[in-house]
Amino acid sequence: MLVWICAGEASGDLLGARLMAALRRQRQGVAFAGIGGPRMAEQGLSSLFPMEDLALMGLLEVLPKLRRLAGRLDQAAAAIAAARPAVLVTIDAPSFTLRLAARVRPLGVKVVHYVAPQLWAWRPGRVKALKQRVDRILALLPFEPAFFEAAGIPVRFVGHPVLEGGAGEGDAARFLAAHPILPGERPVLVMPGSRRTETARLLPVFGAALRQAANDLPGLRPIVIAGRLVEAAVRQAAAGWPNGPILVPDGPGKADAFAAVARAGGAGLIKSGTSSLEMAVAGVPHLVAYRVNPVTAEIVRRLIRVPHASLVNLLAEREVVPERLQEACRPKPLAETLLRLLREPEAMAAQRVGFAEALGRLRPAEGPPSEAAARAVLELA
């Protein structure tokens, strides 16, 4: 049985790798083809082309790449038509993957889309088009099935992969043995994103905020998680940050950094997204920040339908984690919010209560998320 899998960015690559492993555990003789990154390659996938070609974010950021993306779409559709897999699993990256689904579903290929598009958050009218493109959605969040079921789209809540990502299982002692945090230092975990477009916008702002905060709190020590695609840019930017930042590759070792920051009473300055859930699992109080092109931001403002950007806040249905978005994503507001968090133990304790609330709603009844996802895929294959 051939399963064709398409991931478009680092988070999807990790999801795809876990899904591939779970599919192998549940079905003998399964084979894979598709598009993925290094994690999926470790599971035996030979990517049709570099996954990085699809890792774009923001309306204006995508426009200059449209011709290349169209070519990659043609290439992927032709490969699927030739292979005739039992099922196509598209993972997140809906601007590409759902177009691919639309091209191949008329061929009789079953399509499972893993990570529900956030149509419940903005432009809900698009759900009608989605119904024509997929046979099943695998939802990560517990409130998503009701939205898609109302539109007649089969959906399965499989739970969020952060629950099996090991974010809360790090070894603080191991990290501190390699990277001592001195008495009086307050670590700040910095996660500026894994896409080049994100880090290009956030790194200068985060750096300026850390410098401002260090003026009031001289012991502030940045610990920066650097994704593979952006490691060089992160390293270059962090060289000018205060007190000798510690760079940690985005991989299994980052959980040790999370544990060390939590033990040392530190906090996080985090790009809005799944990183916030990782911080919740690890018990690290934090604030989230995000900034996109001003034109993109104005379009999104007109279409957005939810009160929060942070997944922790959406799950808790209140603001657990401070959000500093767009105009508020500037050095001064970020520095002030970070300092307030570091100086107020009660604020940290309140966040941890909210983390437990939010995470309690993420756990599926069917076991680990990747196993639940594999079962849902095999039902259609």
Enumerate the predicted regions with their spans.
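Nucleotide-activated sugar donor-binding and catalytic core shared by glycosyltransferases
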Residues: M1-A381
